[in-house]
C-alpha cells in the first residue's frame, strides 16, 4: 500500500480525531501533525488530545502510522544563547513523551538546527550535544532529522552534515532521516534528472535504512538556490515526473510520504487545501495542468 498523506491540523476538542477525519477526506493513508502550534510552546495536556477516538477512526480507515513534526522554535544548534538551547532540549523531551502517548507515530521530524553565525561545525557539535541530552535507549520513537535547503545558517544542508550529526550521537539508533524533496533540490542535489544517483549517494553517506520519512514538495526555485519555498506538485522546478518517480520508487515503498504543498487561491482568507487532488494525481500517474483551478473550485 502506498503510504501518502499531508500535513493536517489537530485542533478544537476533536484533536487527533479531527486530524484523522481531515486526512481521510483527502484519500490519505498516513498524515503528519504538530502536537500544538509550531511557533510557540503552548500545548494541550496529553489527556485532551482525544487519542482513543482518533486511533479508532484511523483504524477504521486503514491508517496505521502517522508522523509528528517538532515545532520550529526548537533550535539545539544555537551556541550563543544557552536559554534557546535549553528550551530546545526540554521541549524536544516533551514532544517525545507526547508522541509516545499517541501510540501511532514512530517518527518525530526535526529541523536539525541553525548555527546562528557560529559556523556549521560549531552548530553541528551543539546539535549533537542537544540530542545526546535528549535521547534515551528506552524511547520508542525516533527523531527524524530533516534534510535542509541551506537557507540562512541551517545545519543539515548536505548528506555529510546529517551523517556527521548521526555519527556524533550516542544512541543514534534512535535517529532517522526525513528526506524533503524541495529542500534537497534547493540544496543543490539533482533529484530531477538523477534521483537514483542521489539516493545511492544518500545510501553511501547516511544509509538508506535511515530514510524513514519523505516530504513531497515541488520547489518555487531553481536547483541550488538555497531558498526553501514549496510549490504545488508539478508547478515548480522539480516537476510532476520526478516527484511521481520518487513517490512510487521501489526502494521507498514502505516510507510514509507527506505533502506540505501550499494552499491555493488569491484570497488569503479563502485558500483551499490542495491535498485531495494532489494525492489523486500522484496515484494516477498523469499530470493535470488544470489542477490549481480545480482546487480553487472545491
Curated annotation (Swiss-Prot):
Swiss-Prot/TrEMBL GO biological process terms = base-excision repair
Q: Which UniProt keywords apply?
A: DNA damage, DNA repair, Endonuclease, Hydrolase, Metal-binding, Nuclease, Zinc
Pfam family membership, one: AP_endonuc_2
Q: Paste the cofactor note.
A: Binds 3 Zn(2+) ions.
What domain of life does the UniProt record list for this protein's source? Bacteria
Q: Catalyses which reaction?
A: Endonucleolytic cleavage to 5'-phosphooligonucleotide end-products
Give the residues the record marks as binding Zn(2+) 3. 183, 228, 230
List its EC numbers. 3.1.21.2
Kindly list the residue ranges recorded as spanning the membrane.
none
Give the first-level EC class, as a single word. hydrolase
Stored SUPFAM superfamilies: Xylose isomerase-like
Tell me one GO molecular function of this protein.
phosphoric diester hydrolase activity
Residues annotated to bind Zn(2+) 2 = 146, 180, 215, 260
What residues bind Zn(2+) 1, as annotated? 69, 111, 146
Q: Which cofactors does this protein require?
A: Zn(2+)
| Family that this chain belongs to | Belongs to the AP endonuclease 2 family.
User: What is this protein's function per UniProt?
Assistant: Endonuclease IV plays a role in DNA repair. It cleaves phosphodiester bonds at apurinic or apyrimidinic (AP) sites, generating a 3'-hydroxyl group and a 5'-terminal sugar phosphate.
In Swiss-Prot or TrEMBL terms, this protein is called Probable endonuclease 4
The UniProt gene name for this protein comes to: nfo
Amino acid at each position: 500500500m502506498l503510504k501518502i498523506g499531508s500535513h493536517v491540523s489537530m485542533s478544537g476538542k476533536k484533536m487527533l480525531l479531527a486530524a484523522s477525519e481531515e486526512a481521510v477526506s483527502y484519500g490519505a493513508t498516513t498524515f503528519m501533525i504538530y502536537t500544538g502550534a509550531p511557533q510557540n510552546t503552548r500545548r494541550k495536556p496529553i489527556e485532551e488530545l482525544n487519542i482513543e477516538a482518533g486511533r479508532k477512526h484511523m483504524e477504521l480507515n486503514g491508517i496505521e502510522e502517522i508522523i509528528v513534526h517538532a515545532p520550529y522554535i526548537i533550535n539545539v544548534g544555537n551556541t550563543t544563547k544557552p536559554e534557546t538551547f535549553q528550551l530546545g532540549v526540554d521541549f524536544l523531551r516533551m514532544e517525545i513523551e507526547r508522541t509516545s502517548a499517541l501510540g501511532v507515530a514512530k517518527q518525530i521530524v526535526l529541523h536539525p538546527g541553525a548555527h546562528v553565525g557560529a559556523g556549521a561545525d560549531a552548530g553541528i557539535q551543539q546539535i549533537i550535544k542537544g540530542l545526546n541530552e535528549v535521547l534515551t535507549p528506552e524511547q520508542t520513537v525516533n527523531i527524524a532529522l530533516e534534510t535542509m535547503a541551506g537557507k540562512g545558517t541551517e545545519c543539515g544542508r548536505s548528506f555529510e552534515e546529517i551523517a556527521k550529526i548521526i555519527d556524533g550521537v550516542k544512541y543514534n539508533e534512535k535517529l532517522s532521516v526525513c528526506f524533503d524533496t524541495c529542500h534537497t533540490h534547493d540544496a543543490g542535489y539533482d533529484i530531477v534528472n538523477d534521483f537514483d544517483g542521489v539516493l545511492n549517494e544518500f545510501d553511501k553517506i547516511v544509509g538508506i535504512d535511515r530514510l524513514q520519512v519523505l516530504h513531497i514538495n515541488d520547489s518555487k526555485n531553481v536547483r541550488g538556490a538555497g531558498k526553501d519555498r514549496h510549490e504545488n506538485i508539478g508547478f515548480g522546478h522539480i516537476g510532476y515526473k520526478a516527484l511521481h518517480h520518487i513517490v512510487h520508487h521501489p526502494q521507498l515503498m514502505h516510507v510514509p510520504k507527506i505533502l506540505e504543498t501550499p494552499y491555493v487561491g488569491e484570497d488569503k482568507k479563502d485558500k483551499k487545501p490542495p491535498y485531495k487532488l494532489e494525492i489523486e494525481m500522484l496515484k494516477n500517474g498523469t499530470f493535470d495542468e488544470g489542477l490549481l483551478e480545480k482546487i480553487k473550485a472545491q
